[in-house]
UniProtKB/Swiss-Prot annotation:
Miscellaneous comment as given in the Swiss-Prot or TrEMBL entry: CTPSs have evolved a hybrid strategy for distinguishing between UTP and CTP. The overlapping regions of the product feedback inhibitory and substrate sites recognize a common feature in both compounds, the triphosphate moiety. To differentiate isosteric substrate and product pyrimidine rings, an additional pocket far from the expected kinase/ligase catalytic site, specifically recognizes the cytosine and ribose portions of the product inhibitor.
Stored HAMAP family: PyrG
Species, as recorded: Aliivibrio fischeri (strain MJ11)
Reported regulation of activity: Allosterically activated by GTP, when glutamine is the substrate; GTP has no effect on the reaction when ammonia is the substrate. The allosteric effector GTP functions by stabilizing the protein conformation that binds the tetrahedral intermediate(s) formed during glutamine hydrolysis. Inhibited by the product CTP, via allosteric rather than competitive inhibition.
SUPFAM superfamilies: Class I glutamine amidotransferase-like, P-loop containing nucleoside triphosphate hydrolases
Record-listed Mg(2+) binding positions: D72, E140
GO terms of biological process kind: 'de novo' CTP biosynthetic process; pyrimidine nucleobase biosynthetic process
NCBIfam families associated with the record: PRK05380.1 (NF003792), PyrG (TIGR00337)
The protein, known as: CTP synthase
Quaternary structure note: Homotetramer.
Tree of life domain: Bacteria
Cellular-component GO terms for this entry: cytosol
EC number(s) given by UniProt: 6.3.4.2
Glutamine amidotransferase type-1 domain sequence ranges: 291-542
């Protein structure tokens, strides 16, 4: 299969939405029957984002095969059906580490290792490898044109485009066209300078996607086309919209997919966007409102919980409910008390690391349990629910996780020292293991108990969900918890690790060790989130059995 490539770059400012624009184009091409994949090239020196602060980088998205990747891969999976893998995201740090490892082995036979050709060749090899087996690969380069960090990546895609030829490679560049209120007009000069910067490194864009807070009129598009050396029909106006799921239609309406197919000589049927039309309809026509309290420690940057945010919205679509997320700092719960949780229709405690704010999360779980508020715990959110139950129901005074308290008498959560990974290999860890890449990662099989809420929601005896954690329920103390009424409704493939817990005498209290948010999409939703938001809606209407 011959693969064609679309390289996506950004200019003027960061956070323009390259990932969303690229994923939207991919969604249209997929809707035309083409096999599409996406890649994200990150210029930072970290080997992967796994150990980066969520408040700086945003969430870490985990793929089926256990790669810790950029949050843009979450956008990719929410827009297209193709599942991402470790081949779909790599960093400058990963490339340099691989090249240096080869140099130490003597693979380069004594050559002087340089950015060109060794680093650029390594980048090209990874891009080609990740694109195999697809009609089109859309490759997004992180950062902004002109950044020194991204130069090796820009050079690599320039070389690759030359090697592939014009019939197999094209460039799409995102820029900002700001509106100056004082002058009362849109300004195209930043876009012109951005393209000039791109030209200086040998790249001529074929499509310009121009971000603005309003539709860019034809005369301004004509001006941009003239000064940036692109066809007028290839200047795409991408105005701000109230939902990212409207962007595929916005791009399709301007013929962007036709430009791609014409360039690559592809004959494909017209895109069927009926699924996206349904998503937009559901989003625009809710029948009620719910307020979900998200009690976390990284709330100053909502992108730290990007997939959770989106999964709640998806569940809202499926239930025809408008979901408002109220972010609650878990440290505020510690200092101000659970009064700040009053008025919430449901409570969600997401994953996290470290002991800062953990007692606030425990209090949130207690509040939800005692006041019969629907509760969904994810990863650490399950662990704090377990700790709270142990302390206040199972009479295990001072119960805690060994992550936060080494000398607790009841370590109901402890370090996993051995487990089977997604490929069936036995993994072992100790307290001295490196932090990066040493967690239980990727898709794992889970057995669901008969008669459980989890099994009712999923409708299956087994499911596969993605994990990212190094602490688990202590099986030695599990009998005492179960005797006190806790229900274990999900177990790992070998039935040795607890994956889901429930409280039977509560209207809706479910917590999972895995991350269900990573597999939720706007078209399909996710059973746990759908059930959770449904319970919140029933709570609002007074229909929830207390």
């Amino acid at each position: 299969m011959t693969t064609n490539y679309i390289f996506v770059t950004g200019g003027v400012v960061s956070s323009l939405g390259k990932g969303i624009a690229a994923a939207s184009l991919a969604a249209i091409l997929e809707a035309r029957g083409l096999k599409v994949t996406m890649m994200k090239l990150d210029p930072y020196i970290n080997v992967d984002p796994g150990t980066m602060s969520p408040t700086q980088h945003g969430e870490v998205f985990v793929t089926e095969d256990g790669a810790e990747t950029d949050l843009d891969l979450g956008h990719y999976e929410r827009f297209i059906r193709t599942k991402m893998t470790k081949r779909n995201n790599f960093t400058a740090g990963r490339v340099y580490a691989d090249v240096l490892r080869k140099e130490r082995r003597g693979d380069y036979l004594g050559a002087t290792i340089q950015v060109i050709p060794h680093i650029t060749n390594a980048i090209k090899e990874r891009v080609i490898s990740g694109a195999e087996g697809h009609d089109i690969a859309i490759v997004e380069v992180g950062g902004t044109v002109g950044d020194i960090e991204s130069l090796p990546f820009m050079e690599a895609i320039r070389q690759l485009a030359v090697e592939l030829g014009r019939e197999r490679a094209m460039f799409m560049h995102l820029t900002l066209v700001p509106y100056l209120g004082a002058a009362g007009e849109l300004k195209t000069k930043p876009t012109q300078h951005s393209v000039k910067e791109l030209l200086s490194i040998g790249i001529q864009p074929d499509i310009l996607v121009c971000r603005s807070d309003r539709v860019i009129p034809a005369n301004e598009r004509k001006k941009i086309a003239l000064f940036c050396n692109v066809q007028e029909k290839a200047v795409i106006s991408m105005k701000d919209v109230d939902s990212i799921y409207k962007i595929p239609q916005l791009i399709k309406a301007q013929g962007t997919d036709d430009l791609v197919c014409q360039r690559f000589g592809i004959t494909a049927p017209e895109a069927d966007l009926s699924e996206w039309e349904q998503v937009i309809y559901e989003e625009a026509n809710p029948t009620g409102d719910v307020v979900i309290g998200m009690v976390g420690k990284y709330i100053e940057l909502p992108d730290a919980y990007k997939s959770v945010n989106e999964a709640l919205k998806h569940a809202g679509l499926k239930n025809r409910l408008n979901v408002t997320i109220k972010y609650v700092d878990s440290q505020d719960v510690e200092s101000k008390g659970t009064e700040i949780l009053e008025g919430l229709d449901a409570i969600l405690v997401p994953g996290g690391f470290g002991d800062r704010g953990v007692e606030g999360k425990i209090l949130a779980a207690q509040y939800a349990r005692e006041n019969k508020v629907p509760y969904l715990g994810i990863c650490l959110g399950m662990q704090v629910a377990l700790i709270e139950y142990a302390r206040n129901v199972a009479n295990m005074e001072g119960a805690h996780s060994s992550e936060f308290s080494k000398d607790t008498k009841f370590p109901v959560v402890g370090l996993i020292t051995e487990w089977i990974d997604s490929e069936g290999n036995v993994e072992e860890r100790t307290e001295k293991s490196d932090l990066g890449g040493t967690m239980r990662l990727g898709s794992q099989l889970c057995h669901l108990a008969k008669g459980s809420k989890a099994r009712e929601l999923y409708g299956n005896a087994t499911v596969e969900e993605r994990h990212r954690h190094r602490y688990e329920v202590n099986n030695n103390l599990l009998p005492q918890l179960e005797k006190a009424g806790l229900k274990v409704s999900g177990l790992s493939a070998d039935k040795k690790l607890v994956e889901i817990i429930e409280i039977p005498n509560h209207p809706w209290f479910v917590a999972a060790q895995f991350h269900p948010e990573f597999t939720s999409t706007p078209r399909d939703g996710h059973p746990l989130f759908e059930g959770f938001v449904k319970a919140a809606g029933e709570s609002v209407r007074g229909e929830l059995e207390k």
